[in-house]
């Protein structure tokens, strides 16, 4: 392409031939150098285009204006470089894509080249790994269920304890008042028995009405205390003529009584009390015992 441009410019400018011959004729011995340089421009690589004018300038064979006149430094000469550089970029991209495709193909080939034994071994390894993971999942599930059950039991136990603490908060206080209730009961019962024996005709001071009012006041106090106990959940128990229960009764003595079955409560010394079905004081009682054995022993001794 450079040769055609040079020849076209030489043919168009006939006047320049004389100037060119005047420059070239005294130095005929250097024409082979220019020819060889020019030959290197045509058949050489694009990267050597800049080296030619530099070497010519150093040797002084041609003038810079002459070289420019013949198109060695024209702006159009740089276009092939750009085109060539632009054409080289996609080559690099194509090469990288080819490499990636080659790698993927090699991977597929490697996977396809696995033998049947290798595939069976790989599947067995995956199955073993899956079994281990399933076992871990079952263990974690079991731990979760156990922990959840423990938390649920703890919540239920905490609620029961809170409810129990609320119910039995007055237990100690109520226990300390039981003796007061017993004393009021004894006083009312004794005074009532003695009051029936008083002769009102001999009562000159008028103490009988006062004693009667006192008895009524004691009975009212006893009833009021019993009502307070009932509201607080404290219940009085009178187990007379009931079967003896060691969980709720305390046997103090035995009474031989043939009219009642063995183990029946014949006497009550102290009444029992329970707070929401919890016994806070067992009843002190006297229990009947068998009489037949004693009579049989007396007959045998006689």
UniProtKB/Swiss-Prot annotation:
GO terms for biological process: protein folding; response to UV. Keywords: ATP-binding, Chaperone, Copper, Metal-binding, Mitochondrion, Nucleotide-binding, Transit peptide. One of its GO terms (cellular component) is mitochondrial matrix. Pfam families: GrpE. It comes from the Eukaryota. It is found in: Mitochondrion matrix. Residues 1-39 form a transit peptide. Induction: By UV-B. Its main location: mitochondrion. GO terms for molecular function: adenyl-nucleotide exchange factor activity; ATP binding; copper ion binding; protein homodimerization activity; protein-folding chaperone binding. InterPro entries: GrpE (IPR000740), GrpE_coiled_coil (IPR013805), GrpE_head (IPR009012). Belongs to the GrpE family. Probable component of the PAM complex, at least composed of SSC1 (mtHsp70), MGE1, TIM44, PAM16/TIM16, PAM17 and PAM18/TIM14. Interacts with SSQ1. Essential component of the PAM complex, a complex required for the translocation of transit peptide-containing proteins from the inner membrane into the mitochondrial matrix in an ATP-dependent manner. Seems to control the nucleotide-dependent binding of mitochondrial HSP70 to substrate proteins. Binds ATP. Interacts with copper ions Cu(2+). This is GrpE protein homolog 1, mitochondrial. It comes from Arabidopsis thaliana.
């Amino acid at each position: 392409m450079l040769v055609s441009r040079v020849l076209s410019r030489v043919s168009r400018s006939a006047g320049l031939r004389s100037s060119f011959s005047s420059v070239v004729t005294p130095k005929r011995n250097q024409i082979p150098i220019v020819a060889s340089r020019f030959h290197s421009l045509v058949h050489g690589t694009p990267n050597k285009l800049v080296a030619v004018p530099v070497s010519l300038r150093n040797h002084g064979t041609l003038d810079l204006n002459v070289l420019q006149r013949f198109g060695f430094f024209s702006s159009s000469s740089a276009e092939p470089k750009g085109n060539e550089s632009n054409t080289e970029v996609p080559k690099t991209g194509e090469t990288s894509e080819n490499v990636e495709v080659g790698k993927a193909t090699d991977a597929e080939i490697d996977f396809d080249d696995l033998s049947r034994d290798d595939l069976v071994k790989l599947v067995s390894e995956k199955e073993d790994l899956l079994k281990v993971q399933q076992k871990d999942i079952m263990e974690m599930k079991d731990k979760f269920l156990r922990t959840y059950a423990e938390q649920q039991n703890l919540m239920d136990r905490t609620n029961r304890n809170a409810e129990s603490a609320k119910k039995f908060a007055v237990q100690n206080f109520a226990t300390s008042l039981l003796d007061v209730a017993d004393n009021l009961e004894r006083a009312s019962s004794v005074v009532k028995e003695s009051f029936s024996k008083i002769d009102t005709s001999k009562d000159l001071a008028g103490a009988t009405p006062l004693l009667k009012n006192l008895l009524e006041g004691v009975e009212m106090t006893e009833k009021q205390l019993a009502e307070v106990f009932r509201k607080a959940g404290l219940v009085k128990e009178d187990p007379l003529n009931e079967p003896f229960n060691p969980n709720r009764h305390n046997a103090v003595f035995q009474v031989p009584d043939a009219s009642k079955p063995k183990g029946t409560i014949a006497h009550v010394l102290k009444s029992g009390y329970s707070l929401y079905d919890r016994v806070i004081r067992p009843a002190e009682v006297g229990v009947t015992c068998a009489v037949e054995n004693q009579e049989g022993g007396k007959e045998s001794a006689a």
